[in-house]
Structures are given as C-alpha cells and as structure tokens.
C-alpha cells in the first residue's frame, strides 16, 4: 500500500502545474481479468478505538449510544448545499478550468447534475486546484456551478443548525454511486472504480443490478498493482492524466467475497439491517455472495420497512438506510424537496421513538454529483478521497450548532460503529479514520428531538427518469 499522504486544510500542496486538457470519455478497452478477487487490504491498526482516542470519551460513547444509523443520500457537495452556512468553510463562487471566477448560481429544485464518475472526480479535482468541474460531461454549461439557498432546503439547514455539521467530510472515492456504496459497508471497493453494467461484448443489452445473479455483468476495476505501479497511478491522478489511468482498467464480474462491516456485527452478535430501494447502484451488497446467498440476506430489507420497524421498537443496533432513487436527492430522478421530505419522515420516526435518546444518525451524500466544491480532498491513495460532501451528525449527544472541521470520510462512520461496539477494523482506511467522537458531548444536556413538518414542494415541469 502507498504511504498515507494528505492535503492539510487551508494549506498548499505541490502539484505538477499543467494546462487543464483532461476530458472525460468512455474508457479504453482494457484486458479482461479472469483471476480471483483481491485479498482484503491489511488493516494498519487492528484494535479500535485507536490510541489517539480518549478512552474516557470512548467509555461514555459506549454507555450513551446503542443505535447508529448511517443515512446515505446522493450526489451533492458541501458547497452546493451548505456553501452559505454561517461559520462553515463554504464559498459562493468557484473557478473554472481556464481560471475564470464564476458565481455559484441559485439552484432550482430540479436542477440537473453533471458527470460524477471515478474519472470525473479526478478531472474536477485537477490535482488539488478544484477548478475543472466545467470539463465534465454535461458540465460545459456550468451545470455544476450552482448552490441552494437556505430558504430552498430549510429542513436540511434546520438539522445542520440544531445538531453538528461536518465541513471536512469527503467521499471515500472519486465516484460514482455504486463504488461509494462499497465503501459505506466495507471501507474499500475491492478495486472497482465504476458502476456495474451489462457485458459490453454482448452489446450492452440486459438488466443491470443483478451482480452475483448474472455472470454476464461487468464493472471497471483496477488490476492488481505492484507498489511501483500504484505509485505511478497516484502520480497520474495528481497530473491528472485520466486517459493513462483508464488504460489500466480491467473488466470484472461484480461478484466478489470481501469482508464487510455486517460480517463483524454478525460475529459479535450485534443486530443490523441494510434498508434500501430497488436501484441497482444502491444495492451493491448483492455483489457479496456470502451475503446474497446466505442467511445474512434476510437483513437486507426494503426501505419501506424502516419506519414501521422504528415504530415497533425494533431499531437495530446498526442501520444502513438508503432511499429509492426518486427521493435520493440524485438530480434527474426527483426534486430535492421531495428527497428532503423523505429524510424528514425517517428522522421524525427516530426522534419520536423512545430509542432517540440512545441514537446517533450520520446523514450524508454519497458522491459529488458533478457539483462544484472548493476544498481540495486529501489524496490518500489511488481511490481518493473524492470531493467534499455534507455530513450532519444528529443525536441527543452531538454538539448543538457546532461545525465539525476534522477530516473524515465514509470510513469514519464505520470507525464510529467499530469504536462504539468494540469491533476490529476492516481495512487500512477505517483503521486510520477519524471516528467522529469529538462531534459529540456525552455530558451535555441532551438535544431534544427536532420533529419537522414536511413542506409543500414547488411545482416543476421537469420530466424525471424512472429510478434505475
């Protein structure tokens, strides 16, 4: 593995200064990989919590938190939703690849996004300059340079104002959705860098989303690299040279047995469920055969069961909650207002439950969606970080009205779960991740529930896609 290197907030990173000539297109045809899947990346530190975590704080967390809910929406950056938030590291204008300064235009409730693939993330970041979001597919008309005002997303802002808003929380990978959703359960993607799809040599026809159930499905992946080859990919990401990076990719069947956090929960006898919608890009757990074809599959449930379970007093100790596409906040599948209302319904159920007093929710968005953000992500390894996304820590014990500015990513939520429930790490990423515990004050007067009203959504003429 590469040594861990990070860009420090507000600092400068030395990068190769090149003209921004990167473009995003279809990957060149790579070799077909027929070997087995990658071994589990070694954890640099097995015991959790790590030595940097105050043990008294850990003890309080284990006493106060009995339930953790990882609520994952889609495709928004921090600057898109919270760039105007007082006290947070946000901006109201951005830079394009030619150096122009452009205001972040007031977004519409149904504004489209731009490309947000793995290579799109590399292009947009542009070696840390954060100025080539206009070079993405569908981004040349500055579609990604938009921003919501507080009156447009009042309930998301209410959660941020009442609880703890994280302004240095990054996507674990450059993108896209399916890849990020591996990270939220495994703290790795087993080298995958793209959404799965029908086999292109068969004409690209067929149904997506069957993963292990369809041996003809494929997804783009990095091959096994030597350390030297991995260092070269890291260098190419700094340039960036996406054409050279894509040329290394191979096709693999997205059916691969890696250990995921639910395995650790099962072994420890800790209850869990993974609530999700039908979108294939949000159900990557189907690609883990020991889950798909074993007894753990019974704990992969429809999102529609979440609120009834909470109301019945059956909230698991650990929950992944992933919405259906039309209320996921993904541009093109539904209006943001509808997605916000869905989130309110889920959180109201938790806050009206007796278990609220023992619960921590981390609400976040899975990738950047092609939208502008100005903060350079740490370049930890060849997978990311990707661009910054919002995260809100919602709990009776999260610091009220606070800005959490420590560097974190999706692996941090896994680390929080591992710390609270005394579990080992899965990979180097979560072993070294921030565990978010300093976003909490377990000796404060508990935050009361914030039960919000759903709002009437503005009319729209947009024609949305059916959820995949």
Identify the function of each model-found stretch.
Residues 1-9:
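Bacterial N-terminal signal peptides that target proteins for export
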Residues 16-19:
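C-terminal motif of bacterial Sec signal peptides marking the signal peptidase cleavage site
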